[in-house]
Amino acid sequence: MVRNSSDEEEDHRNLIPQNDTRDNDLNLRPDARTVNMANGGGRSPRSALQIDEILSRARNRWKISVNKRYVVAAVSLTLFVGLLFLFTDTRTFFSSFKLDPMSSRVKESELQALNLLRQQQLALVSLLNRTNFNSSNAISSSVVIDNVKAALLKQISVNKEIEEVLLSPHRTGNYSITASGSDSFTGSYNADICRKVDQKLLDRKTIEWKPRPDKFLFAICLSGQMSNHLICLEKHMFFAALLDRVLVIPSSKFDYQYDKVIDIERINTCLGRTVVISFDQFKEIDKKNNAHIDRFICYVSSPQPCYVDEDHIKKLKGLGVSIGGKLEAPWSEDIKKPTKRTSQEVVEKFKSDDGVIAIGDVFYADMEQDLVMQPGGPINHKCKTLIEPSRLILVTAQRFIQTFLGKNFISLHLRRHGFLKFCNAKSPSCFYPIPQAADCISRMVERANAPVIYLSTDAAESETGLLQSLVVVDGKVVPLVKRPPQNSAEKWDSLLYRHGIEDDSQVYAMLDKTICAMSSVFIGASGSTFTEDILRLRKDWGTSSMCDEYLCRGEEPNFIAENE
């Protein structure tokens, strides 16, 4: 039976197996799809179901394939992490992923540098204001120059600090960017500005003290406190050397007990012969005359001859000292208006064949200042100075410095008790308000670059407390160290306890002088003999500094009270 082509095609379609895995029309050739469409073309319901089933199976297979891939990826990642921990330094590895802090460090340094530049600007403005002074408050040119130098040095240091701050973020590990060498410059310049004073010992002019053993000069010192008496005693030595006499040290019943604070016998050692003797030794030598003063040749004539009143004459006689003749002066000499005298004038007026003479108090004597003010004084000897603290006081001062101060410190003698009226009687006054004094001290601290100040003062706690709060440099309070009250737990003053002189006020006064004389820089009180004796020791010991000065030198107090 002959079948037409259309029947054969239909039979062919019906013979396709149900489990055929080929895709739908998307997988048919283009020409087959064209023929199918031309013959009326839609699929039967059965063929549509078969295609859906095929698509569902394909999707299931895809899901299984994806799940397998996830498992493989997870296993691979686990193996990788395990190998990473086994064969690498994880700390180093993960640290490499940290954020670089360089930018934040640079920003912080820049802010610090800006702040320092602002401080530098304010300091330079302050310096400019300090140099703009008028004639009513004239500051000596040397003071201005010193202050300008110190301020400029300070600003160089600030500039160095700014440089360090800006460079700090760039210093990492062993690598370092080096700043300029201004620190060595400022260090050497700072040392130079407060360097020790050249003593010029080779230019020293002296006289010999070779006394006749039977000729004596009886020392009498009455004005003021211990410092005045020591200055008077030193001048007596000069007179004794000029007059070829042995100097008799006064009795402690008439004057201070000098052997507690100075070593009398050491003076003889320094000259290699007996030039001074104690009052007791004098009485022993002069037994025949019963300690008799043959003649008073008074250096001072006014307000009273020899500056000795009747009460002191009675005290001398009470010691068994007899006095021959009257108290007479060879010239007119007023303590309020001292006249400059020469060595030749003294020898002419005071030369005598009498065995024992006295010239009275010579504290106010103004004689041969160029010789007297030399390091070591006007007399030839082999020591640094003739009058210096005893060995006990000297070692105690050294122990105090080692305990509390160290090598580099400023010493300050701040005289306050009874000083207000004394200073206001002078022109200009030397009594400064505490805030003004603190400003002067702070400037000196900047110049000397010292970390601590030793304070020798008779001021009340209310004044020293205020001063301590106001002495500020670079935003930091500079410590003011005072000698502490006696404490048995502290051993720095054990030598004084051991020798029974721990309760003597004159011993502690000399201890204060000794500590001040050993400082790097000294600030004194103008008009105070305590300060003058410290300056003498510093000059003789070679500790004087180019920065040594009186408090607020060249300035007047910014406020002065009226007279009563």
Curated annotation (Swiss-Prot):
Glycans are attached at N129, N134, N174. GO terms for molecular function: peptide-O-fucosyltransferase activity. GO terms for cellular component: membrane. The chain crosses the membrane at residues 70-90. Residues 1-28 are annotated as: Disordered. It is found in: Membrane. Keywords: Carbohydrate metabolism, Fucose metabolism, Glycoprotein, Glycosyltransferase, Membrane, Signal-anchor, Transferase, Transmembrane, Transmembrane helix. Its EC number is 2.4.1.-. Substrate binds at H413, L414, R415, T529, F530. It is an enzyme of class 2 (transferase). GO terms for biological process: fucose metabolic process. Pathway: Glycan metabolism. It is a single-pass type II membrane protein. The keyword Transmembrane helix applies. Belongs to the glycosyltransferase GT106 family. This is O-fucosyltransferase 5. It comes from Arabidopsis thaliana (Mouse-ear cress).
